[in-house]
Amino acid sequence: MSLTLILIRHAKSDWADPGQPDHARPLAPRGRRDAPRMGAWLARGGHLPELVLCSDAARTRETLALMQPEWPTTPEIRHAPALYAAPPRKLRGALEGMGARSIALVAHNPGIGQLAADLAAEAPAHPRFADYPTCAVTVLKFEAKDWSSISKGHVAAFAIPADL
């Protein structure tokens, strides 16, 4: 069975209020511009999730809220506190037991970028894949019976807002 994993780092966040808790930081104007563009890019490529697992931080929720209207279908959305600042192991663990064949994870660096690198059978030639900038998106394809049995996957697509 073919499984698709879409790894999305939140869009550029706002650092204007130094006293604001990290969890509550909203998107910066650039992030609010980039997120819909990346959502449209996913839709044009036919990379649409059935399920979205999203960190409950303000900037990940806002990124998803701006991407999702660009998609022709509405996925099930679950906001998960455990995905906030999660390491790759925890992000990957969130997939286990999920029945959806196409899942998007919306999370934070360094975890989301490390997970993309860990799961890619071959990293894309893109010069920004290694540092996984804000609003970077990787689409990985796996031939596996379920999420607990995925190993290395094929990178079907990778982009950052500057590419569009």
Q: How would you describe each model-predicted region?
A:
Residues 2-82, 124, 132-133:
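Active-site-proximal alpha-helix that buttresses catalytic centers in soluble enzyme cores
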Residues 82-99:
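Short phosphate-binding loop-to-helix
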Residues 123-154, 158:
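Domain-level recognition of soluble alpha/beta enzyme cores
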Residues 5, 100-107:
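Generic beta-sheet signal
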Residues 17, 63-64, 89, 114-117:
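Short glycine-/acidic-enriched loop or helix-start segments at secondary-structure transitions
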Residues 45-47, 97-101:
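Glycine-rich phosphate-binding loop signature in dinucleotide/nucleotide-binding domains
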Residues 160-164:
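Short, cationic low-complexity segments
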